[in-house]
């Protein structure tokens, strides 16, 4: 900063620059000094300290002044200092010096760089020069300044980087690469890009043209590991063996304990040792031959005990395998891959490629490279009732082996027997055909069933009193097995599956079964019938049945059992047809009276031989069972479980009649129970009163005794005149007590007489009331019977008055009119409704006459008097029945 002062005091080791404005030349004034500024001069800045370079330091000055040989500063003709423009000067430790005008302190005071041991400076020449030894250095040359030492910088030299030595430890190597052609520290010539390893332990300082790639660790080898290497190029390894590019080899602990991979070696991995025990073996694929090359496509079997390393290119087939140790019940199925001979001397056996043979234990077997183990076979233990299916692969025949332990030969395999899905499901259910026959088919087991072993002989336990039919499709014949028995299927045999009807009413194919139960058993069916007067009823019938087999050893006789696949549905349909035909010829009233006899006669029929009656007329005798000759089914009895009207109005009328009878019976029983309760209450009350009187009598007796004792005591205590007075008083008390006792007895007798009289009176009253109530009920029943009879007669007369033809005309008038209307429209077909919408002629007559639903055909039964089949009125319900007659009461649900 310029100053305007005229007197400037310059301290020691300071300086200023003075500009002569006339000549425009600057000069240096150095202190200590007092400088008087002239008018034509200008001080450019205040006094400034000189540049002091301490020892072991340096600074860089740009545009330095020129000096002569003696070191004096040179000036030009104008008095201006002569500068070396665009040049640099490095000044080391010296006396303090000022900066002349034009000089610039480019780099401030800087300590000299100390190069430590194992360290070097990478230097590069910027200009040509000669070093202190007189050697010429060309710009671009590079070299190292290695420590220890202090580096004195030069303006012609640039410090590129600081290089640190790399420490090489045991089992390590330094990988280097030449940046250009050079000589390494061992005196070997290296070309550009060449790589090599330095294995000398210690600190290694790379040369100027050596590039450190990485520090390579040695691979420690043990007896159980080997190093897998591959050559990157042709070279000689550390053992002096020539390696070609791509060649692979192993280095084991026998070669070296620690191996440092060379720069021309590629580490593919560490190979573990393969150890075989005394019962192990392995198959090596593509084994290495004596020439060290892999024999492609070859195999070698190695048996333990042995340890080895897999050579490059070798691999194990299925790893380490166990030697086959076979017992007496084991064997091996072998196949020859190549022609070979087995055995020794005379026992040699030749096998061609593809041959199969079986060896049996006990022995230890190691398959050779020419033999393939197809499978290991185990003898199959079979119980007396167990078996397997075996197929000969040469002939194709299948047979069943049952009851003994068996091992398949080389030409045999297990054969799987397929069963129809229905049979498979029935076998897997595991249900007892007899005990579980009532369970529904929809009740499935929650736990999944284990799949059947298809190679095992299919067996089925036939329960007692049952039969199973098995059909042989090869022999084209069937056999029937009766239980209890265990039936086993041959290779070509199948079960005959029964598809039975079930439910109420019976539904076809609702239940499937393998065995046929021979009975006795029962099944129930619901059928709908229609009487001659068009009354529709629903019957629930139960039939007891069984199968009759005269000779179980006769094949034709036993085959009849399975001639009808659905004997339940067939029998129910046949019986229902007979019942419908029999009921269709009788009226509702007759059927209601004799339902059991009619149904039994319809089901069983009559004997063919007719007996003669007393008057010489033929009397057919009813049968006691129905026989179906197709399959020998016998229906031994019929149970009519329920009879229900299908028509709602008929059902309501019957229900009201039954309710009325129930109410009458209930009221009668209620009155009798009430009378009995009152009688028991009167008896209990009389006994209670009698007990009270007896208790009072006993109390009086005790009081009498007490008074006697008191009197006696008074008599003992008193003497003289007091004795007489006491005796008189005691006598009076005795007389009074006897009077009280007598009075109590009389009262008790009077009360008993009154109670007995009252009881007799009440009993007479109750008997009269019961007679009166019974008479009233009989009058009401008689009235109801007479009304029903009148209604029946009225309905009968109306029906007779109208006539059957008129009723028929009324019934078909509507459909005929509809048919004519359809014909007028040109239609050629007529729709006939099914049984769900029948023509009810029974109610049509009442509708035509304008009568209500009260006109039910009940009068006929009343008019005919109480009968054994009557189930509506109370009198008929209590009437005795004839022997052998069945009484059927309609059940309303």
Swiss-Prot record:
Region (Disordered): 856-893
Tissue note: Present in most normal tissues. Higher expression observed in epithelial cells with secretory and excretory functions, as well as in cells chronically exposed to xenobiotics, such as bronchial cells and cells lining the intestine. Overexpressed in many multidrug-resistant cancer cells.
Cell location: Cytoplasm; Nucleus, Nuclear pore complex; Cytoplasm, Perinuclear region
Modification(s) after translation: Phosphorylated on Tyr residues after EGF stimulation. Dephosphorylated by PTPN11.
Induction context: Up-regulated by IFNG/IFN-gamma.
Key words of the record: Acetylation, Cytoplasm, Isopeptide bond, mRNA transport, Nuclear pore complex, Nucleus, Phosphoprotein, Protein transport, Repeat, Ribonucleoprotein, Translocation, Transport, Ubl conjugation
In-chain residues carrying the UniProt-annotated modification N-acetylalanine: 2
CC per GO annotation: cytoplasm; cytoskeleton; cytosol; extracellular exosome; extracellular region; ficolin-1-rich granule lumen; membrane; nuclear pore
InterPro entries: Band_7/SPFH_dom_sf (IPR036013), MVP (IPR039059), MVP_rep_dom (IPR041139), MVP_rep_sf (IPR043023), MVP_shoulder (IPR021870), Vault_2 (IPR041134), Vault_2_sf (IPR043179), Vault_3 (IPR040989)
GO biological-process terms attached to the record: cell population proliferation; ERBB signaling pathway; mRNA transport; negative regulation of epidermal growth factor receptor signaling pathway; negative regulation of protein autophosphorylation; negative regulation of protein tyrosine kinase activity; protein activation cascade; protein transport
Glycyl lysine isopeptide (Lys-Gly) (interchain with G-Cter in SUMO2) cross-link, renumbered residues: 444, 704
Location of Phosphoserine modifications: 445
GO molecular function: identical protein binding; protein kinase binding; protein phosphatase binding
MVP repeats, residue ranges: 2-56, 57-111, 112-164, 165-217, 218-272, 273-323, 324-379, 380-457, 458-520
Domain notes: MVP 3 mediates interaction with PTEN. MVP 4 mediates interaction with PARP4.
Subunit structure: The vault ribonucleoprotein particle is a huge (400 A x 670 A) cage structure of 12.9 MDa. It consists of a dimer of half-vaults, with each half-vault comprising 39 identical major vault protein (MVP) chains, PARP4 and one or more vault RNAs (vRNAs). Interacts with TEP1. Interacts with PTEN and activated MAPK1. The phosphorylated protein interacts with the SH2 domains of PTPN11 and SRC. Interacts with APEX1. May interact with ZNF540.
Function of the molecule: Required for normal vault structure. Vaults are multi-subunit structures that may act as scaffolds for proteins involved in signal transduction. Vaults may also play a role in nucleo-cytoplasmic transport. Down-regulates IFNG-mediated STAT1 signaling and subsequent activation of JAK. Down-regulates SRC activity and signaling through MAP kinases.
Name the record gives this protein: Major vault protein
Species, as recorded: Homo sapiens (Human)
């Amino acid at each position: 900063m310029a100053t305007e002062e005229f007197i400037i005091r310059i301290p020691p080791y300071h300086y200023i620059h003075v500009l002569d404005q006339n000549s425009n030349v600057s000069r240096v004034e150095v202190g200590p000094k007092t400088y008087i500024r002239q008018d034509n001069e200008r001080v450019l800045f205040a006094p400034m300290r000189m540049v002091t370079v301490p020892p072991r330091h340096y600074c860089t000055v740009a545009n330095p002044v020129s000096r002569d040989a003696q070191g004096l500063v040179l000036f030009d003709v104008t008095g201006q200092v002569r500068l070396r423009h665009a040049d640099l000067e490095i000044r080391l430790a010296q006396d303090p010096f000022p900066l002349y005008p034009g000089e610039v302190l480019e780099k401030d005071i800087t300590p000299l760089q100390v190069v430590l041991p194992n360290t070097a400076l990478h230097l590069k020449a910027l200009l040509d020069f000669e070093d202190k030894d007189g050697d010429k250095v060309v710009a671009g040359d590079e070299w190292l300044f290695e420590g220890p030492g202090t580096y004195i910088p030069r303006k012609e030299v640039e410090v590129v980087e600081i290089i640190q030595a790399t420490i090489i430890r045991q089992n390590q190597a330094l990988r280097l690469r030449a940046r250009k052609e050079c000589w390494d520290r061992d005196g070997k010539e290296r070309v550009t890009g060449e790589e090599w390893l330095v294995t000398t332990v210690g600190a290694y300082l790379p040369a100027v043209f050596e590039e450190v790639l990485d520090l390579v660790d040695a691979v420690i080898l043990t007896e159980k590991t080997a190093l897998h290497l591959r050559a990157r190029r042709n070279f000689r390894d550390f053992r002096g063996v020539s390696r070609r590019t791509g060649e692979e080899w192993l280095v084991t602990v026998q070669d070296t304990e620690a191996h440092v991979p060379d720069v021309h070696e590629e580490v593919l991995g560490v190979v573990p040792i393969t150890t075989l025990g005394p019962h192990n073996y392995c198959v090596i694929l593509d084994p290495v031959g004596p020439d060290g090359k892999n024999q492609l496509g070859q195999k070698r079997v190695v048996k333990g005990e042995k340890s080895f390393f897999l050579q490059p290119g070798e691999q194990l087939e299925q790893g380490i395998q166990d030697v086959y140790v076979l017992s007496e019940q084991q064997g091996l199925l072998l196949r020859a891959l190549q022609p070979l001979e087995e055995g020794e001397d005379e026992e040699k056996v030749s096998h061609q490629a593809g041959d199969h043979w079986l060896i049996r234990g006990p022995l230890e077997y190691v398959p050779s490279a020419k033999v393939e183990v197809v499978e290991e076979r185990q003898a199959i233990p079979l119980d007396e009732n167990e078996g397997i299916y075996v197929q000969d692969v040469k002939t194709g025949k299948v047979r069943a082996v049952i009851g003994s332990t068996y091992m398949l030969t080389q030409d045999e395999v297990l054969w799987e027997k397929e069963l129809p899905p229905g049979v498979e499901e029935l076998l897997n259910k595991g249900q007892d055909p007899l005990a579980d026959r009532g369970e529904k088919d929809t009740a499935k087991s929650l736990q999944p069933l284990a799949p059947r072993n298809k190679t095992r002989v299919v067996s089925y336990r036939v329960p007692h009193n049952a039969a199973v039919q098995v059909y042989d499709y090869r022999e084209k014949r069937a056999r029937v097995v009766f239980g209890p028995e265990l039936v086993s299927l041959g290779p070509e045999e199948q079960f005959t599956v029964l598809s039975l009807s079930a439910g109420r009413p019976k539904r076809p194919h609702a239940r499937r079964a393998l065995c046929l139960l021979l009975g006795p058993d029962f099944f129930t069916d619901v059928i709908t019938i229609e009487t001659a007067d068009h009354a529709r009823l629903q019957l629930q019938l139960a039939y007891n049945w069984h199968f009759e087999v005269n000779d179980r050893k006769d094949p034709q006789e036993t085959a009849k059992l399975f001639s009808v696949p659905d004997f339940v549905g067939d029998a129910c349909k046949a019986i229902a047809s007979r019942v419908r035909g029999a009921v269709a010829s009788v009226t509702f009233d007759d059927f209601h009276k004799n339902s059991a006899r009619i149904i039994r006669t319809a089901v069983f029929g009559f004997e063919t031989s007719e007996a003669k009656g007393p008057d010489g007329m033929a009397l057919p005798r009813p049968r006691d069972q129905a026989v179906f000759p197709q399959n020998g089914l016998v229906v031994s009895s019929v149970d009519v479980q329920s009879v229900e009207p299908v028509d709602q109005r008929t059902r309501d009328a019957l229900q009201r009649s039954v309710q009325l009878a129930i109410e009458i019976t209930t009221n009668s029983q209620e009155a009798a129970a009430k009378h009995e309760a009152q009688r028991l209450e009167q008896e209990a009350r009389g006994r209670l009163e009698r007990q009270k009187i007896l208790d009072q009598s006993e109390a009086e007796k005790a009081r009498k005794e007490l008074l006697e004792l008191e009197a006696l005591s008074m008599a003992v205590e008193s003497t003289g005149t007091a004795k007489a007075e006491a005796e008189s008083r005691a006598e009076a008390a005795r007389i009074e007590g006897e009077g009280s006792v007598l009075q109590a007895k009389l009262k008790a007798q009077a009360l008993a007489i009154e109670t007995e009289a009252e009881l007799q009176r009440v009993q007479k009253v109750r008997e009269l009331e019961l007679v009166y109530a019974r008479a009233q009920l009989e009058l009401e029943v008689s009235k109801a019977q007479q009304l029903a009879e009148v209604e029946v007669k009225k309905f009968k007369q109306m029906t007779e008055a109208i006539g059957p033809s008129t009723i028929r005309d009324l019934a078909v008038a509507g459909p005929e009119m509809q048919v004519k209307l359809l014909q007028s429209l040109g239609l050629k077909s007529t729709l006939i409704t099914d049984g769900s919408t029948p023509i009810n002629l029974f109610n049509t007559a009442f509708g035509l006459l304008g009568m209500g639903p009260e006109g039910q055909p009940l009068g006929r039964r009343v008019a005919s008097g109480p009968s054994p089949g009557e189930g509506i009125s109370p009198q008929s319900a209590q009437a005795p029945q004839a022997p052998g007659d069945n009484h059927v009461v309609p059940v309303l649900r």
